[in-house]
């Protein structure tokens, strides 16, 4: 009989942090050994990551502990996708090797997975902290230091509507890896539908949206972990901000529309993204990589312009329909 949950850790050249995270997991998982499997996927590290994995495999010999070492560095997103595709349990929870998680999180997750047979997605609320200043960080549209502002712990709401709310409030919230537990069969199906998701840094939003549209969703009110802002893998990539804002987010929105989300919602999200992009990012990229920047931004501008035109036409049609109805009503009252 398959176990309930795979807790997967993708890692690369962070042996010390991995050791600390596995030490946390060894304590947090006590009492749930029969429900869980552990998977560590090493993205071809050159430090002593393998020694750390072997040490903890020997220590945690009462639980299924799988490990993988890629023959080359696949990049962080592909390593995450490997973890998701390799899970054989009903649910998969892929966690960062450096994210601070509360001890009670594992027990909470297991209890919710056991209690809701049709659950397809679980978001653990989290707080944010700036790595340099230590100051609290959270979306400006949300009050208090948390990243989700919807309370949905009974899993009986409209999963699609819950995801739409969360996504519209904060893209960052729905792509925070450690905050998300997916139902394995759904996340694998989503990856089969869009194989190129592994080349999109925002694709975790698509995976969450797909799962949300196909079952129950839980979003916790309390926070169970912390996101340290300023250490993300994509922030180290030179073109990351340009690609994420002008290419990857629009791609995800279009994929959501292809997989059941309304045209109205996706159009609204594209227009919202058009308002929120930082044009300084484009201007900076234009100086450094002119051709690449232009090739990235021109399709984005065309897409947002098309959405804006579509909205204008819809408003004109509604206005015309309203005027026609009013005229008919006036004629009906004529003597």
Q: Where do the PLM segments sit?
A:
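Membrane-interface aromatic/basic loop that binds lipid-linked glycans or pyrophosphate carriers
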Residues: 270-335
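Catalytic core of nucleotide-sugar-dependent glycosyltransferases
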Residues: 222-225, 236-265, 285
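Short, flexible coil/linker elements and helix-boundary hinge sites characteristic
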Residues: 26, 61-62, 114, 192-195, ...
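Nucleotide-sugar donor-binding/catalytic module of glycosyltransferases
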Residues: 1-241
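Generic detector of well-ordered alpha-helical segments enriched in charged/polar residues
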Residues: 160-164, 188, 250-254, 266-267, ...
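Non-membrane alpha-helical secondary structure
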Residues: 45, 238-244, 258, 270-274, ...
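Generic surface-pattern signal
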Residues: 54, 58, 147-149, 168, ...
């Amino acid at each position: 009989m398959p176990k309930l949950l795979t807790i997967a850790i993708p890692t690369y050249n962070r042996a010390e942090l991995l050791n600390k995270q596995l030490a946390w997991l060894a304590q947090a998982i006590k009492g749930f050994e029969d429900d869980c499997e552990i998977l560590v996927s090493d993205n071809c590290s050159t430090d002593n990551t393998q020694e750390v994995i072997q040490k903890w495999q020997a220590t945690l010999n009462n639980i299924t502990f799988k490990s993988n070492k890629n023959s080359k560095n696949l990049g962080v997103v592909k390593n995450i996708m490997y973890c998701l595709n390799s899970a054989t349990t009903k649910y998969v929870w892929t966690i960062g090797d450096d994210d601070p998680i509360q001890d009670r999180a594992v027990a909470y997750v297991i209890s919710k997975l056991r209690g809701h047979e049709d659950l397809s997605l679980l978001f653990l609320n989290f707080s944010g902290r700036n790595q340099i200043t230590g100051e609290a960080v959270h979306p400006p549209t949300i009050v208090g230091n948390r990243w989700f502002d919807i309370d949905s712990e009974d899993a009986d709401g409209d999963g699609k509507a819950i995801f739409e709310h969360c996504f519209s409030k904060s893209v960052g919230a729905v792509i925070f890896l450690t905050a998300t537990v997916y139902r394995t069969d759904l996340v694998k199906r989503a990856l089969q539908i869009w194989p190129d998701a592994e080349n999109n840094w925002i694709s975790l939003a698509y995976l969450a949206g797909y799962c949300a549209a196909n079952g129950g969703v839980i979003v916790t009110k309390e926070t169970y972990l912390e996101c340290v802002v300023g250490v993300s893998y994509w922030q180290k990539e030179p073109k990351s901000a340009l690609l994420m804002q002008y290419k990857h987010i629009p791609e995800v929105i279009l994929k959501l529309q292809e997989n059941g989300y309304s045209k109205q919602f996706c159009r609204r999200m594209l227009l919202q993204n058009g308002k929120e992009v930082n044009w300084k990012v484009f201007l900076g990229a234009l100086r450094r990589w002119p051709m690449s920047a232009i090739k990235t931004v021109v399709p984005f501008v065309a897409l947002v312009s098309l959405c804006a035109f579509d909205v204008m036409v819809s408003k004109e049609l509604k206005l015309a329909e309203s005027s026609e109805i009013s005229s008919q009503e006036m004629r009906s009252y004529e003597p």
